[in-house]
Amino acid sequence: MKFGKKNEIQINPLKYNFALIGESGIGKTTVIKEYCEKLAGEDGYIFLEVGKEDGASAISGINYITCPEWDADYDEDTNTMGFNTFIEDVVENKATDWKDLKVVVLDTYDEIFSIGEQEVIRMHNKENPQKRAKSINGCFGGYGAGLEKTIEIVLNALWSLKTVGVSFIVIGHTKSKNIIDPVTGEEYVQLTSNMTQKYFNAIKTKVHFLGVAAIDREIIRKSTGKKDNKGNDIKKGIVQGESRWITFRDDSYTIDSKSRFADIVDRIPLNADALIKALTDAIKAAAIKSGADIKILEEIQAKADQAKAQQVAEAEKAHKSQKELDIAIGEIVDFFTKNKTDIEIIKPILAKCKEMGYSNPKEISDLDDAKTILAMTLK
């Protein structure tokens, strides 16, 4: 028997994992909001303002939820919810409550690991009450095990979104870092993520596109009107002008960017239209190289999306039915436990179970049967 299938490139940029990092206040959140609205519509995206991130409060019309911790029910007054709680709700209710959702934006990625570490500490202390940890380095045996566990729970949460057809975009911050070239031994400065390298690499290896937003400043040397002790004019750098760019490829490796699509442009202006065009053109170029017809490919993928939505809806319905069945069986078992010494009460219910083909209530596999039995316990 033959296994596997031939991959077909998907043209829609939202089908791919994307990360955008840049300095604070450069406009990352605004650009990604506009990018999502143009590709997914106003109801097709949502921002998760994670931890202490607060960028959405300054952007009019943005769809967002604040996620200050890992698990917490939704609070309508504060518009807050646990990060993982939100993810689980989307996965469980995609076909109903979240039917239009296509992409979740995590703002910022570094804050996700902050709340993830607190969850890992909680998990460790629950499993090891006699050897409690106060920091991530003391969790699960130490030696980096706590960091690995944090990466595991974060990536598991993100990948669960993909199982129901929802992609993710991550936003992060940057810093300048001194790097030593492994071949020449020379040191150079690279613009990269400001988070722990292990955490950054965990997502860098998973995304298809990593863009780095930065300001390109034109600086000129201008006289101050003063002279030094040798009589020379003292000059200082003046910013003549500046422009904001997203870099996807940098041959000098001074910008820590990435693309899995070979034909991506090196850099683009920091705006949504340029971003959409750059990603779409790179994806289409890869598809054309493989001999695909773009129009036919789009039609095939539209049908595949419909089939995926139907599959998710059926799985969601089955999951909810099973959940309802489990709850009903639990209540029936509780009833039998409380009344196990009163044979007159439980005898007719046991008889009904046997009539339905079950030797005991725990064997009930049909929701309607469970509802019938449960109704008898309430009389």
Regions found by a protein language model. Name each.
Residues 29:
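Walker A/P-loop
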Residues 51-55, 109-111, 174-178, 216-219, ...:
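Conserved nucleotide-binding/hydrolysis micro-motifs of P-loop NTPases
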